[in-house]
Amino acid sequence: MNLDGSAQDPEKREYSSVCVGREDDIKKSERMTAVVHDREVVIFYHKGEYHAMDIRCYHSGGPLHLGDIEDFDGRPCIVCPWHKYKITLATGEGLYQSINPKDPSAKPKWCSKGIKQRIHTVTVDNGNIYVTLSNEPFKCDSDFYATGDFKVIKSSS
């Protein structure tokens, strides 16, 4: 609710940064999980860069914090351990290999499905890691597993 009593649009909410841990800890483990403003996220430290995203895969809610990080076409991706979906760490795009059925001998190429996984901002200050949730106005497929119906279903089972 806003100060005037009107409901706040969750798509336009401004989120504050939340301290999720120490830089030394994530550099050792290369990943950590946290709850930021009631949203589960995973934070990765890969090749000197920090990345944060919703913890559950956009496809079927798989646990991304248990996946491997691999490079596909020069882009670091988390590979969902359930169905091997590839998600770029930097943008949240889902990647797939395209095959030309008219030329089966051609080498498959990596293509984007678009942004499927919500990405969040990571900052470091005085050795502490902070995550700020995305307030991008578009919907991502991973939003289903981070909010609303899925959380209600999950908690009631």
From Swiss-Prot:
The modification N-acetylmethionine is found at residue 1. Binds 1 [2Fe-2S] cluster per subunit. Residues 16-94, 17-131 form the Rieske domain. Disulfide bonds: none annotated. [2Fe-2S] cluster binds at residues 57, 59, 80, 83. CDD domains: Rieske. GO terms for molecular function: 2 iron, 2 sulfur cluster binding; metal ion binding. Signal peptide: none annotated. Keywords: 2Fe-2S, Acetylation, Iron, Iron-sulfur, Metal-binding, Phosphoprotein, Repeat. InterPro entries: Rieske_2Fe-2S, Rieske_2Fe-2S_sf, Sol_Rieske_ferrdox_dom. The modification Phosphoserine is found at residue 6. Its cofactor is [2Fe-2S] cluster. Coiled coil: none annotated. Pfam families: Rieske_4. This is Rieske domain-containing protein.
